[in-house]
């Protein structure tokens, strides 16, 4: 089967009146075939990455006798976060993922019941895969921490995530309010060390302000 692109343009006389039509047919069979091949490869890549992540999750679950339940759930949550953002890459043929979609995806478990508890505000920003994965894991860790000890752990707690990009830098600000009193932990947890390392690898910075009325986390990343 041949795929044809047809363009029709009006033909006008000297007075500007339409007296006919010009039709141009182009054979775009190869172009269409290439697009379908790319789409197939993208779906296959998604399938393989999901299988790999599923295998890792299964391995963690099988280590039940050796791995504490809390650690196991934490690892599974991070793996699921990566799987979610990988699904977004397929939609853009691995160009990247939209920041708003990542944020909505990561915070959905905490905002579905009562959307006033979570506010997301920022312009459209397409993040390349490496940066998108870093942001996804970071938001996952912040949300998990807030659900355990912060604003998302109490009925009236609120979280606001805002961002803007300028001069090749993405600035994110995570603000918790109306939650339980918090203070800076004596020791950094594994999750905190993970996101600090990931952000540093992207030549970015992260700052935690442990206010009594709620955590403020500010992140700067090159995009």
Region locations from a protein language model:
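PAS-family sensory domains
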Residues: 7-9, 17-27
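Sensory coupling linkers of modular signal transduction proteins
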Residues: 15, 26-41, 45
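Short acidic helix/loop segment immediately C-terminal to the autophosphorylated histidine
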Residues: 60-72, 93
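Short beta-to-alpha transition helix within the HATPase_c
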Residues: 73-80, 84, 88, 95-112, ...
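Short beta-strand/loop element within the Bergerat-fold HATPase_c
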Residues: 156-168
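ATP phosphate-binding glycine-rich loop and adjacent ATP-lid/helix-beta elements
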Residues: 181-209
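Conserved short strand/loop->alpha-helix "switch" segment adjacent to the catalytic nucleotide/phosphoryl-transfer site
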Residues: 36-42, 111-157, 186
